Amino acid sequence: MRHRSCFSLFAGLALVFCLAVGTAAAGPVQVDIYGPGQGSLNLAMAAPLGPTPGTPVSGMGVKLNGFINENLSFLPFLRLVDQRAILGGTVMQGYKSPDIDLKRFQLAGADLVVTAGWPQGDASGSFVELRVYEALSGKLVFGKAYSHVEDGLLPNVADRFCSDLMKALTGRGEFFKSTLAFVKHDGKNKRDVWLVKPVGRDLRKITNLPGEALSPSWSPDGRFVVFSHFDDRSHALGVWDRLTRQVQRIRFPGNTVIGPCFLPDNKVAVSLSSGRNPDIFLLNHLFKKERELEANPSINVSPSFDATGTKMAFTSSRMGGPQVFMKDMTTGQVTRISKTGSYNTEPSISPDGTLVAFTKMTDTGHRIFVYDMVTQSERQVSFGPGRDEQPSFAPDSYFLAFTSNRNGAQQIFLVTRHGGDPKRVPTGPGDASFARWGMIPE
């Protein structure tokens, strides 16, 4: 029954009111999240209404608005308008034009207004209509109906709606569809891989092996998570299969398995040592060694690929201390991209191939920097306190996850490619680290 409800919810979004309404003279409100001067918008939430005009609902409707508010607090380009600032309150006569009074929201400084209508009431199994209006012009940005809504599915409805809203405003909506794989400390010499939504929901443990898991990586198809694993006896490649919920541990000759990373074709790059120093190897779809990707007398670790698989960022000690390099997988050319500092590690290339985030040791500690491949310049995007490390670009090439102990314990934080105020991802008790983004198919 629950499976059918989920299918109805996401496959049956039959009622689409409008998408990106606009004219040649005045298009819909949009935000450029990639340009240097990122703008922001003020957004207000109207009270959810039932079938009787001017009468708010008090059950699932209130909960859904709460989940939406919680989600939108993670978007730095949206500022939520305090309901107390709206003269006349947030309860309107209707939830769609012309029965909505946008003037009160406009006076409170809102650029956008979200309305929620429950034509059959908000009992389990009903449907909700969600719309977004421009406060000034009254234009509809978009609207959708979500059917067969149940209490347990409300977070999913909020995620889907917020993804649609972000896509309408920015052109990208992957953030709310993403899932982070990360490592959580669970006692002495015990670390396992966990999953969590970037807003902190759906927290769950997926491995339970003796020893320590490190550096998880999602496959592009959302089926596998690979990770480094070591116990008292050996190092190995761990593989979790989402379809079977099984974990296997794969050994290789040598004693080191470091930083596995999926390529766009679902093959894996990983650092293995068969001699003195580790080199980067390609594994096939059966996780068997296929060929070398980068070999050098020095240490070569931490591969990271763009969405095309033609660019590989990695860390190497070939110039003495660890530095970040870029390899053109078509020509084989290798270029150093960490221009300053004596200790630069843990690169993460953005899927669009334009940026590389990495950890730099500075005079004030380890910090996250972003190198721009176009302008060939770098900028600092995290500022502590404590130790900031292990950056990871999201599928939208906008958000970055990283690990920090600024509050004492290791925790996961989100920031954007531009920097800004970090937002902590709730992961429960225990140290959390090595966050990596993935997309699970709906």
Curated annotation (Swiss-Prot):
Gene Ontology biological process terms, A to Z: cell division; protein import
Signal peptide region: 1-26
UniProt cross-references to InterPro entries, sorted A to Z: 6-blade_b-propeller_TolB-like (IPR011042), PD40 (IPR011659), Tol-Pal_TolB (IPR014167)
Database matches in Pfam families: PD40
Keywords for this protein: Cell cycle, Cell division, Periplasm, Signal
Compartments, record wording: Periplasm
Keyword Cell division: yes
UniProt entry tagged with the keyword Aminoacyl-tRNA synthetase: no
GO annotations of cellular component type: periplasmic space
Function of the molecule: Part of the Tol-Pal system, which plays a role in outer membrane invagination during cell division and is important for maintaining outer membrane integrity.
NCBIfam families: propeller_TolB
UniProt family annotation: Belongs to the TolB family.
Self-association state and partner proteins as the record states: The Tol-Pal system is composed of five core proteins: the inner membrane proteins TolA, TolQ and TolR, the periplasmic protein TolB and the outer membrane protein Pal. They form a network linking the inner and outer membranes and the peptidoglycan layer.
HAMAP family according to UniProt: TolB (MF_00671)
Protein name per Swiss-Prot or TrEMBL: Tol-Pal system protein TolB
Gene source species: Nitratidesulfovibrio vulgaris (strain ATCC 29579 / DSM 644 / CCUG 34227 / NCIMB 8303 / VKM B-1760 / Hildenborough)
